[in-house]
Amino acid sequence: MEDTQVISDAQRLTEKLGQLPEPVVKPTLIVVSGLPGTGKSYFCSKLAERLLFIILESDALRKILFSSPTYSLQESSRLFRAIHHLIEELLKKGMPLILDATNLSERNRERLYNIADRLNAKLILVRVEASPGVVYERLKARSEGMPQGNSDADWAVFQRMKHTVQKIRRNHYAVDTSRDITPVLDKIVREVSR
């Protein structure tokens, strides 16, 4: 039996999704990974301009479940149990999804691979990166109050997390958001259409 907390949390997140796209026979799950400030949310927003996908942005979803997030391991564990449950339920309904989260550990990504494999969903993996100088400027602008989305991460968080990045062991796209992202967007749109 599933944890009632997970189901309750996933329901709260579902209520905030708004209008859902039309279901498809074989939905796609696009998992976007990368350190804070590398441009994951920007990349996801550009992708969503071209694909009618639901974006599940972990930073925004965290703030739905926790009004004053602490980013503790316990909080993150609860958040991602709810996100994984939500992904599973939406894929079962034929909803195409983009998961926008750091997704730095292969063990955590394995859970997503298993969900996609079990539900026969197409899985597309994307590693987003940018040079440390570009990331520093983006995070500095974020800390100075420039509108940068839902993330609270700063340069210190980036520095701490960069040592936890694990290689993606499956085929994936790599995109440097300090350069033109159009070629990778084009490839992903084509892959979704196949």
Question: Each predicted region: which residue ranges?
Answer:
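Conserved glycine(s) of the Walker
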Residues: 39
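Extreme N-terminal, non-catalytic leader segments
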Residues: 1-27
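Glycine-rich phosphate-binding loop used to anchor ATP phosphates in small-molecule kinases
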Residues: 77-119, 123
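Conserved phosphate-donor/acceptor-positioning beta-strand/loop module used by diverse small-molecule
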Residues: 119-139
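Hydrophobic anchor at the beta1->P-loop junction of P-loop NTPases
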Residues: 32
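Conserved substrate/cofactor phosphate-moiety recognition/catalytic segment
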Residues: 42-93
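The conserved Walker
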Residues: 36
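Small-molecule kinase domains that catalyze NTP-dependent phosphoryl transfer to phosphate-bearing small molecules
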Residues: 145-187, 194
